[in-house]
Design a protein with these regions (language model features):
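Short coil/turn residues that cap or connect secondary-structure elements
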Residues: 88, 92-95, 123
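N-terminal positioning helix adjacent to the helix-turn-helix/winged-helix DNA-binding module
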Residues: 80-83, 94-96, 127
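Short alpha-helical "recognition helix" segments of helix-turn-helix
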Residues: 112-117
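N-terminal interaction/assembly modules
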Residues: 1-90, 137-145
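Short amphipathic alpha helix immediately N-terminal
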Residues: 92-106
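DNA major-groove recognition helices of helix-turn-helix
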Residues: 124-135
């Protein structure tokens, strides 16, 4: 049985794994947004105030600022995915590796996983604990938790 500290760590690892697809989708959405010709009209940053002045930015400046922000978001999300992929690569030879895909990427229930691999439901919980234990050091090394 996992200790309270292990449960907290496992929960953090699971949160990162469940978020993987969200990062992939966000990158795709941001890339589409960068290619959108209506980009300037969708985001209005007309005036900035400071030191008693009102600065009105041109449409080109607004577009460039928005593109820069989107590119920064894409870069940040790609970095997170890269670190997750590196951690997963370290355990890919683990006999229970396919549990990660079934549970966290395909969102199968423990019952569905048990049926799929032909084990008792309680065994899937043991498999989860084993695979998350194997991932723990790699997630810490990659500064994901």
């Amino acid at each position: 049985m996992a200790t309270q500290e292990q449960k907290i760590i496992f929960r953090k690892i699971e949160d990162v794994l469940y978020s993987y697809k969200k990062y992939v989708d966000k990158i795709k959405d941001d890339l589409k947004e960068l290619e959108n010709p209506q980009i300037a009209k969708r985001y209005s940053i007309d005036k900035l105030t400071g030191s008693g002045y009102v600065i009105v930015k041109s449409e080109l400046e607004r577009i460039e600022e928005l593109k820069e922000r989107l590119l920064n978001d894409i870069t940040r999300h790609e970095e997170i995915l890269f670190r997750i992929d590196n951690a997963l690569e370290m355990i890919k030879d683990n006999k229970d590796y396919n549990f990660i895909e079934m549970r966290y990427f395909n969102k199968l229930s423990y019952e569905e996983i048990a049926d799929k691999i032909g084990v008792e439901v309680r065994t899937t919980y043991r498999i989860r604990n084993n695979i998350l234990s194997a991932l723990e050091i790699h997630f810490k090394t990659q500064k994901l938790i």
